[in-house]
Amino acid sequence: MGEILSVKDIKFKKGEKVFIRCDFNVPMDEFLNITDDRRIRAAIPTIRYCLDEGCSVILASHLGRPKNGYEAKFSLEPVAKRLARRMNREIKFVNDVIGKEAVEAVKNLKENEVLLLDNLRFEKGETKNDPEFAQKLASYANYYINDAFGVCHRAHASVEAITKFYDNKHKAAGFLLIKEVNFAANLTKRPVRPFVAVAGGSKVSGKLQALKNLLPKVDKLIIGGGMAFTFLKAIGYEIGNSLLEEDLVEEALNILREGKRLGVKIYIPVDAIVAPAISQDSVMKNVTVQEIPAGWMGLDIGPATIALFREALSDAQTIWWNGPMGVFEIDKFARGSLRMSHAIAESNATTVVGGGDTADVVERAGNSDEMTFISTGGGASLELIEGKELPGVRVLTIKNDEMEC
């Protein structure tokens, strides 16, 4: 594949400007208070490194999906305030991206100062990978660093097109991006065995390609969450009103067959917590998967399944987990996900957690510090596991024949 250009390889000149593409797409409540700042904290090492090299830093990110230009609820101003608090320093903020205000703010930026531009997606050119928009961003700085792993699977202007305006000595990946790519590479190419993959979440469709790519590489595969019911249907169980992707029943069966052929042990739920509706007030009961009542739906794994999955994890040396075991947002259906988090955290394995929902489960379970690595990217993390090349990584990779001797 070649080698990823690293921020450490750049010979920065004191007083020059660095443009860092970050992923500050953080959740906020209705009052625009940031409810989880993991992504902000994850960007700090690269920002600090560039400041220590004597540069001034321009930060850029998107937040949410604004439809038509500026929308106050998608402004990055709360991010600037949180970053200032986390870094214990002033973070300048401009309510603009490529207009006069932004150009002026960049021009006036002094050595060792940090400026955050407003939401890149307020400009249509960002998601269109528009070279003119990218050129305007590139004109701000002498160097370009991408530390936004969460958007590397998207060919957007600040991720892909912008790199065409920098040579290999002036562009690179930040520490977070390199860490993310290395963890994914080690998982799929050099896992310490036994290697157990845990797949959950609502849909098979979102993880189908990842499951297919992982199957020849893992020793065990654990399937939970809403997606498990498509597998249960595939082997002939009645699943009531549980989530079902009818068009993927055959694919689910193929995965089970392929697992058997490869000698991979595949674990699916043996019991479930079921209810007639997805509600905290709903009546619920624990049944075996053979006894799901008509009109009821499975919303969490049951205690027998928790015990089975814990046993499957007991000898693991590498664990990859993507997707909760149930509707964890509702307390009464969160037990399976939280117990799974505890089991993975207590293992002696290298543990890699992917996906925003899964990271939320781990945080809620109080296990964040016990996991080896929690990925900041959902879609990007899955695509790497699927074996795909990410546009944002490709443009920062020197092919072997381009490497300097």
Curated annotation (Swiss-Prot):
One of its GO terms (biological process) is glycolytic process. Its main location: cytoplasm. InterPro entries: Phosphoglycerate_kinase (IPR001576), Phosphoglycerate_kinase_CS (IPR015911), Phosphoglycerate_kinase_N (IPR015824), Phosphoglycerate_kinase_sf (IPR036043). It is an enzyme of class 2 (transferase). It comes from the Bacteria. Keywords: ATP-binding, Cytoplasm, Glycolysis, Kinase, Nucleotide-binding, Transferase. Pfam families: PGK. Pathway: Carbohydrate degradation; glycolysis; pyruvate from D-glyceraldehyde 3-phosphate: step 2/5. ATP binds at K207, G298, E329, G355, G356, D357, T358. Substrate binds at D23, F24, N25, R39, H62, L63, G64, R65, R121, R154. It catalyses: (2R)-3-phosphoglycerate + ATP = (2R)-3-phospho-glyceroyl phosphate + ADP. GO terms for cellular component: cytosol. Its EC number is 2.7.2.3. It is found in: Cytoplasm. GO terms for molecular function: ADP binding; ATP binding; phosphoglycerate kinase activity. Monomer. Belongs to the phosphoglycerate kinase family. This is Phosphoglycerate kinase. The lineage of its organism: Bacteria, Pseudomonadati, Campylobacterota, Epsilonproteobacteria, Campylobacterales.
